[in-house]
Structures are given as C-alpha cells and as structure tokens.
Amino acid sequence: MSRKLARELTMKVLFEMHINNDFNIQRVEHHLFEGSIEEQQKEYIHKVLNEAILNLEAIDSIIEEYSTSWKLNRIANVDLAILRLAFSEIIYMKDIPYRVSINEAIELAKIYGSDETPNFVNGILGKYVEQEGLMLNE
C-alpha cells in the first residue's frame, strides 16, 4: 500500500469516527488489517490518527479560525475529515513537508468532496501556513 492509499484510508477512518462520534482508536483497528498494509504505512496511519484524536480540540479550533465565518457543524463531514488529516500532518508530523500535506489534501478533496471542496481546503491550509510562517522555514 502506498502512502497515498494510507492517507486515503486514514481520511476515511477520521470520517467514520466523526460520523459515529466515536474517537476511540482501538475501535478502528480493523481498518488497519484490511488488505495488505505494510508496517510502515500502519505506523503512519497510527501516528496520524493518534495525533488527530489527542489534538482534536486544537485542530478543530484552528479549522474554525481559518474557515472564516464557518462553524464546524456547517462544514461538510468529508471536508472536515480531510482538514483534520492535513492539520495532523502539518502540525504534528514535521517529517512530512507541508506542501505534500496540502497537495494530498487537495487531491482527496477532488475525489471525495464537492466542486468547492478543493478550493475550500486549499484556502484554509494556505492561510494557516502563511500566517504561521511555515513558508519562511523552507
């Protein structure tokens, strides 16, 4: 399984957790054993899910802050899952370049979101990296 597919699976798990309002990582273990998932990708999935769950309030606050005039309950569930994934990578997984996280989030948005989702996701993530000065650290 490639990193791209692992990222897609992680987004789906975050989506499911949100829909079920159940952010217990042990309950999603079954996803990690579907098909052939390499150990490296399992580690990535575990890391992202753990960071997303442990930092859910902080990540959601950032999403609300940068999605001007949009409350979380008005953001489409799939858009929220994509943003939670991207922010988990950008903020807590410094070994992944933020540009990769943004590009991959936009690709997921094109596949799973509405016509507006790619621009919405790009706008929020772009504003965040600009405001946080991440572009200066390249």
From Swiss-Prot:
Keywords attached to this Swiss-Prot or TrEMBL record, sorted alphabetically, are:
RNA-binding, Transcription, Transcription antitermination, Transcription regulation
Which Pfam family, any one, appears in the UniProt record? NusB
Q: What are the protein's GO molecular function terms?
A: RNA binding
Question: Transmembrane segments in this chain: where?
Answer: none
> One cellular component GO annotation, for this chain's record?
cytosol
Task: Tell me the GO BP annotations in alphabetical order.
Answer: DNA-templated transcription termination; transcription antitermination
Q: What family does this belong to?
A: Belongs to the NusB family.
Function summary: Involved in transcription antitermination. Required for transcription of ribosomal RNA (rRNA) genes. Binds specifically to the boxA antiterminator sequence of the ribosomal RNA (rrn) operons.
- Name-wise, this protein is Transcription antitermination protein NusB
